[in-house]
Amino acid sequence: MVLAVAMSQDADPSGPEQPDRDACVMPGVQGPSVPQGQQGMQPLPPPPPPQPQASLPQIIQNAAKLLDKSPFSVNNQNPLLTSPASVQLAQIQAQLTLHRLKMAQTAVTNNTAAATVLNQVLSKVAMSQPLFNQLRHPSVLGTAHGPTGVSQHAASVPSAHFPSTAIAFSPPSQTGGPGPSVSLPSQPPNAMVVHTFSGVVPQTPAQPAVILSLGKAGPTPATTGFYDYGKANSGQAYGSETEGQPGFLPASASATASGSMTYEGHYSHTGQDGQPAFSKDFYGPNAQGPHIAGGFPADQTGSMKGDVGGLLQGTNSQWERPPGFSGQNKPDITAGPSLWAPPASQPYELYDPEEPTSDRAPPAFGSRLNNSKQGFGCSCRRTKEGQAVLSVRPLQGHQLNDFRGLAPLHLPHICSICDKKVFDLKDWELHVKGKLHAQKCLLFSESAGLRSIRASGEGTLSASANSTAVYNPTGNEDYTSNLGTSYAAIPTRAFAQSNPVFPSASSGTSFAAQRKGAGRVVHICNLPEGSCTENDVINLGLPFGKVTNYILMKSTNQAFLEMAYTEAAQAMVQYYQEKPAIINGEKLLIRMSTRYKELQLKKPGKNVAAIIQDIHSQRERDMLREADRYGPERPRSRSPMSRSLSPRSHSPPGPSRADWGNGRDSYAWRDEDRETVPRRENGEDKRDRLDVWAHDRKHYPRQLDKAELDERLEGGRGYREKYLKSGSPGPLHSVSGYKGREDGYHRKEPKAKLDKYPKQQPDVPGRSRRKEEARLREPRHPHPEDSGKAEDLEPKITRAPDGTKSKQSEKSKTKRADRDQEGADDKKESQLAENEAGAEEQEGMVGIQQEGTESCDPENTRTKKGQDCDSGSEPEGDNWYPTNMEELVTVDEVGEEDFIMEPDLPELEEIVPIDQKDKTLPKICTCVTATLGLDLAKDFTKQGETLGNGDAELSLKLPGQVPSTSASCPNDTDLEMPGLNLDAERKPAESETGLSLEVSNCYEKEARGEEDSDVSLAPAVQQMSSPQPADERARQSSPFLDDCKARGSPEDGSHEASPLEGKASPPTESDLQSQACRENPRYMEVKSLNVRSPEFTEAELKEPLSLPSWEPEVFSELSIPLGVEFVVPRTGFYCKLCGLFYTSEEAAKVSHCRSTVHYRNLQKYLSQLAEEGLKETEGTDSPSPERGGIGPHLERKKL
């Protein structure tokens, strides 16, 4: 409105300060008008076509007066000298503006320049001039902005905005009130025409948001830029009036009550000099070229180049940099720039030195302020040509380069699209690939169609449907509206910088579109539970182009496909939206990933190319696999990776086949593989072909018995592998491991058949020894008994996390079933052996004794083993998948991280245990110990449940566990820890702790052996590749333990004691132990559990989280500090679990809490707690001993 002109720069002597003031004022203006919340109020003077309060000549006269530096001497019947009500309104608006600014400040925290500007604005707006000088005349405001066109706008605009409430405007009719006074008076300080919150300005229809800096001819060019045409009303007005005035929408007083420019409509903002006089034509598409670009007079042109020009070319001036403009002020501010941006029809020759676009230098503002494309929220203020032209305005050469992501010729370089400064080519590449740049480019490209040029880098859209405020946070998020809010964010450079945040805020919808278009990642949901493989997922994308990466998240039935090109991804999504993809009869939900633009995490194992090759060679492989599959030699790789990576084409026949097969998937695969039908065909057919179990598994995974379910799941495999296992227990570790487990389940049901094997095994001393060894190793992994209990718990635990992961649970169940079966077989074998000949068992015991603690463990573990096997297998099964998941952790919006985390850790555990099992006892690493601990913990928990029945059994299990744990503790730390625990427990009861002592001795011995065998860890690692023997051994040991269980727990502790004696203590100790067991087997068990439970129970509790072997990975990769509550501030920061001091909280809670030591201690602690809970539930007295054990254990840990 004329007011803006009135605000002439001359009026404000502090022209040089204008820029800051602009920034300040603009927010103020925006804020007040909108916040008033009085959008209802503000409309009070519905922006009638700004009827010149005075005739145009009068307006011009007013402008002249303003130029004469007569700030308040505007001839207009200036409502600035307002009634008390107007003043109040202005005050309210000012307050609202402050709030808005504060909010804006929070949004611009990432933009230093923007933050600075906001701070300045806040300081000034905060009543730097009481109440914006509330009645400060536009001229005053104008003066302030005089020097810098843009700044000027900011200063005077605010007033206009506030007045919009009637203050600035002459009575209601003054809406845009051509009157120079417009609303400037009310918001002197905030008077930033640039409405930081376009929403604000738009709300007040009558606000003459932008007029402020028009006042001065020379300097104001930018001023005009500040019209609040962004106001909703204004925008609309523009829509009608601004057809021709893309640049000066604000001027369009008619729609813009604020008319923003004091001139009514666009016409006649002749301000002084007519420079502000962006006559209607000026703005109109016809806007006359004479009105130098942006409708400023020629001299304005010069100034515009400097100031407004800066706006136009965001690059030179801060405009370019401050994407914020378009973001925050975009709506209103944008309007200002919009003013500059001439309508399409008229390429105002506002020559921008940097943007020598002859057709639209001014459009630089409107269309996108070139560099500061945000600056000029060129959003087409209106759908009309003007807007269209603005938005369509071709990018400058340098802008096109930036738009296309071409490397800049000179560095540092400021991205003209995002206003982001880049210092080297690497940064440039990152920026070009980044979300901000992609979104801004998208906005820009959309703006041409929408008539809204992407004004800000973030997400502001140039044009807001309601009004100028493309960005309006409040309400005009509709970029698409034609409203002529082709606000160029130019108006306030300062804001431009600060606005970047806002743009994103306001451009919710736009952003979504941007995101959609910007990324190459397709998010696939609702995958069929057990039957979908990597090949299936990749096949979905192959028809549309090259698939460069993928992530299959089986736990959450989701997948991410990264296509080579965005267009390919978009085409894929569009196609599948029209024709949903179906896998195994289930429709998939396929959409663009709103979270990822590309998948940076690579999956371990085969790469996408390999998978694709697999897909192409699927049939051949299937043909070959049928033979291999059924062959006993077919080893199943235990590594989770191969499976997850190459599910169907999946690994090469034997070895590469991953353990994934243990789950339904494997069955599905088998069936699919058996039939050379393409995968997708296999989809539903697959199901039909699949064992009936596939359906059962899928539909009733939890309802089925473990054995039953596992049997069903692994039916084919189980039997095949069973034969394989019996045939080749050692060679194919992974195969034997899984097969053994499967066999175990199968054997369990056909116990007679299974018994045969068990009997045979026990009958052979060599075998029994092997089994014992395996058991020892496996117990270290998971103590059989403990495992058994853990198994029960695990199913619950894993199922809880798995919840939807029925397949994982099934896998684990299958594995457990296999192990259980093995365990059952072993138990049967052991029992048979016992029944057939106690001597044989004794031999086993002797072998165990020879093994040292290992023997004890195996015995105990036998009983535990059946359970443990299940638990072990379950964790393994679950863990397998999770391992990949962890690496895959590129979680989309779905919140899969939780699921991923749990699966990953268990999977990790599984992996480690396999390796560990392969290792000899001495070779077993701390990882093994940890895994054993976890398994034991689970076992303990389960045992705890069963302990109520057999104290002796517990004692047996516990001692076995303890020794196994000691055996599995290769590190001195582990050894010491167990020793400490044992000692602590011995103290409470020496007699009862005989077992503990024995255990500790065994522990130490085994640990030492392990330590000694650290050298042999490398071989152990090699062995890791063949986990099957370990599994077999573990299973064997578990049967042995089962025997012990059968004998010791039911019969008496003496029996148990004898194994223990044989293991690691003199007969006297064993006697003591046996006595202790008899007297208080639970107590002894508790003690042993306490000693070992800290490690195991913790492990158990944390097993789902991570196994020791994974601890380093978990901490480094997942960066999950655990047990932070144990770090307490002392002189420094002290960890109560580990007894370590740290000077900084970060070191203690972040670094230390992710350390292996802390993690182990936490596991032990949690295991103790778990034991206590179990025993308390059982009603045993063990809690007290456990507590005693825990205390000393922790204390020693502290020590």
Swiss-Prot record:
Q: What is its main location?
A: nucleus
Picking any one GO biological process from the record gives: spliceosome-depend formation of circular RNA
Result of mutating residue 591 to M? Slightly reduced pre-mRNA-binding
**Gene behind this chain?**
Rbm20
Q: Which Gene3D superfamilies match?
A: 3.30.70.330
Upper classification of the organism:
Eukaryota, Metazoa, Chordata, Craniata, Vertebrata
SUPFAM superfamilies to which the protein is assigned, alphabetical: RNA-binding domain, RBD
**This protein's name:** RNA-binding protein 20
Residues with the modification Phosphoserine, per the entry, are: 637, 639, 642, 644, 651, 728, 787, 871, 873, 955, 991, 1026, 1038, 1049, 1054, 1058, 1070, 1088, 1093, 1182, 1184
Instruction: List the U1-type zinc finger ranges.
Output: 410-444
Per its record, what triggers expression of this gene product? During early embryonic cardiogenesis.
Where along the chain is composition biased (Polar residues)?
962-971, 1067-1077
